C-alpha cells in the first residue's frame, strides 16, 4: 500500500472541502486542525491556490470553537482554517462563537444553550439534523 504524507492528505481534504463550499453543499468547511500555528500556516500558499480555483475564501482560526458537536481534543488549543464564500456566513460563525463566550461569562451557558449552540454550529457546517444528532450522541469528550 502506498503511503501518503500528512501534508498531502490534509491538502487533498481541503481541496474536497473547497469544492463542496463552491458547489453550495457546505456553507463553511473546516480544514484539518493543526497542532501549531506554524503547521497551519505552512498550508497557506496551497490553500490560497485552492481558494482561487474554487472561488472561496479562507479565514485563519486561532481559537478553536469548542462545542458538544466534536470532541474537545479535536479543537482545543489547535489551529484551523475555515473555507467559505459568503462573508455573512463567516460573520454568523464568529457571532456564534461570541454568543457562547458571552453565555459563559454571564452564567447562562446552560445545557439547553450548549445544545443550541452546537446545533447551530452543525447547521453552519451544513450537516443534516440526523448527522448533528449522531455527532452529539457519539461525543464522549465534552467540555
Residue spans for each PLM region:
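A conserved ligand/cofactor-binding region detector
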Residues: 1-102, 106-109, 120, 129-138
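An amphipathic, hydrophobic-aromatic interaction surface with interspersed Lys/Arg
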Residues: 115-122
